């Protein structure tokens, strides 16, 4: 929808609504504030409407955005202890995992990108790390689902073009198939890093290193930790699209923090510090987060309004995994949370959230949608989440069970390439004889 529609009228009608008031140090206050925002978010939930799909939101919301939204509601539970939406979150994550429990559901497979699948993978690894209520024994488990996403994406690692990297799109018929973008590779990197920490398995860490090194070598990650958007294989990734988005740097920053936590390496510590400093310098105006590419010009599209929410989430993960970043990141999260709450004073309900938090004057900008609600939810709960989040792993109480072979038996024919063989050999080197001797192609 147009981001300029209704702005003037809305400003006149709703500019005097009272903004959401929240004491960020009080759990009950944050619970109340985020319940208002979460209720607004669920106004866009398709599953509550006749004929709607479980786990999906109303058009024009994208499938990947639904996965990210459930992660936000999961984080609300972790921060506040309020379990109101837990069953909905759990049901949605399982239903959308698809017929083969790999986040390739038949309704979306032909239009799905690697970034789309990866965001669902990040949601289920979040569930595993939080010790979220485990599915029944006859259902796929959170860790298993994350492993399925990882394994399938390894089979798509494309060394024939640009000497590595994931393409944006999975199928060649989709626009963007010839583009290797940062969000796909950054999400894969973070997922690998988190799986390494949760399972204490170096195979995942090795793939995290591969993804990071390739991203750096190709120019997605610059020497000063600027993170650009991607590149086309048509010129062998020699020309970089230099757009900078909040969620791209967040993906790499949090992934680097997980790798630091897993390895205690000074190399990863330096990288985390670099990303954190670049984030603070690039994406904050007077200590309040904003999206420079589109926010000032009011040109953010429907999903771009959600990107800031992911950066706040990833800042929390970063400060958790690499506590030396907390003195820099926590004050930014606090000031952003206050400003985001102040921007939730619009619409007919008086608590609809806008985009331009940097106004910081308890005024709604007239913009609304799923992305606005998602971002505000993540921002408002972030300071409390930082204090509440306990990131489990298998060795310290993480109860989710996995399957290192998940997702491989169901990989489409197009995945049965040299990378599939590379993955098989990689696991076998660690003593996992995971694949059947003969891969039957239909």
Curated annotation (Swiss-Prot):
SUPFAM superfamilies linked: Six-hairpin glycosidases
Catalyzed reactions: Random hydrolysis of (1->6)-alpha-D-mannosidic linkages in unbranched (1->6)-mannans
The keyword Glycoprotein is annotated on this UniProt entry: yes
Intrachain S-S bonds: none
Tagged with keyword Manganese: no
Taxonomy, superkingdom: Eukaryota
Signal peptide: 1-19
EC identifiers of the protein: 3.2.1.101
GO MF terms, alphabetically ordered: mannan endo-1,6-alpha-mannosidase activity
GO BP, sorted A to Z: carbohydrate catabolic process; fungal-type cell wall biogenesis
This protein's GO CC annotations: external side of plasma membrane
Residues the record marks as carrying a glycan: 25, 82, 107, 131, 201, 236, 261, 264, 277, 361
Keywords linked to the UniProt accession: Glycoprotein, Glycosidase, Hydrolase, Signal
Coiled coil ranges: none
Protein family per UniProt: Belongs to the glycosyl hydrolase 76 family.
Protein's name in the database: Putative mannan endo-1,6-alpha-mannosidase C970.02
């Amino acid at each position: 929808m147009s981001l300029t529609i209704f702005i003037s009228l809305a400003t006149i009608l709703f500019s005097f609504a009272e903004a959401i008031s929240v004491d960020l140090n009080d759990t009950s206050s944050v619970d109340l504030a985020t319940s208002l925002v979460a209720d607004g978010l669920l106004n866009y939930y398709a599953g509550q409407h006749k004929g709607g799909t479980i786990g999906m939101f109303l058009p024009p919301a994208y499938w990947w955005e639904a996965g990210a939204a459930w992660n936000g509601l999961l984080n609300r539970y972790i921060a506040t202890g309020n379990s109101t939406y837990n069953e909905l979150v759990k049901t949605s994550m399982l239903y959308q995992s698809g017929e083969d429990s790999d986040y390739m559901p038949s309704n979306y497979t032909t239009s799905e990108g690697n970034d789309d699948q990866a965001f669902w993978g990040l949601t289920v690894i979040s569930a595993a790390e939080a010790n979220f209520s485990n599915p029944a024994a006859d259902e796929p488990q959170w860790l298993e689902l994350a492993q399925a996403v990882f394994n399938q994406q390894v089979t798509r690692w494309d060394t024939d073009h640009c000497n590595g990297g994931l393409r944006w799109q999975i199928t060649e018929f989709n626009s963007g198939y010839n583009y290797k973008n940062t969000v796909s590779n950054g999400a894969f990197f973070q997922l690998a890093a988190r799986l390494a920490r949760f399972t204490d398995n170096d195979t995942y860490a090795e793939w995290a290193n591969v993804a990071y090194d390739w991203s750096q070598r190709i120019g997605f990650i610059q020497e000063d930790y600027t993170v650009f958007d991607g590149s086309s294989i048509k010129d062998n990734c020699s020309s970089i699209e230099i757009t900078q988005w909040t969620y791209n740097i967040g993906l790499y920053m949090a992934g680097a923090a997980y790798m630091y936590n897993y390895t205690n390496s000074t190399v990863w510590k330096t990288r985390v510090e670099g990303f954190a400093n670049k984030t603070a310098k690039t994406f904050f105006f007077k200590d309040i987060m904003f999206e420079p590419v589109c926010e000032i010009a009011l040109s953010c599209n429907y999903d771009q309004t959600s990107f800031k929410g992911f950066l706040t989430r990833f800042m929390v993960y970063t400060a958790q995994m690499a506590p030396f970043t907390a003195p820099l990141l926590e004050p930014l999260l606090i000031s952003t949370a206050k400003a985001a709450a102040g921007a939730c004073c619009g619409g007919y309900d008086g608590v609809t959230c806008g985009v331009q938090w940097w106004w910081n004057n308890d005024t709604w900008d007239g913009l609304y949608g799923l992305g606005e609600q998602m971002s505000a939810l993540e921002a408002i709960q972030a300071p409390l989440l930082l204090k509440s989040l306990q990131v489990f792993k298998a060795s310290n109480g993480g109860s989710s069970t996995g399957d290192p072979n998940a997702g491989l038996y169901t990989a489409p024919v197009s995945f049965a390439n040299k990378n599939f063989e590379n993955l098989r050999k990689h696991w076998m080197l660690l003593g996992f004889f995971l694949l059947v001797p003969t891969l039957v192609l239909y």
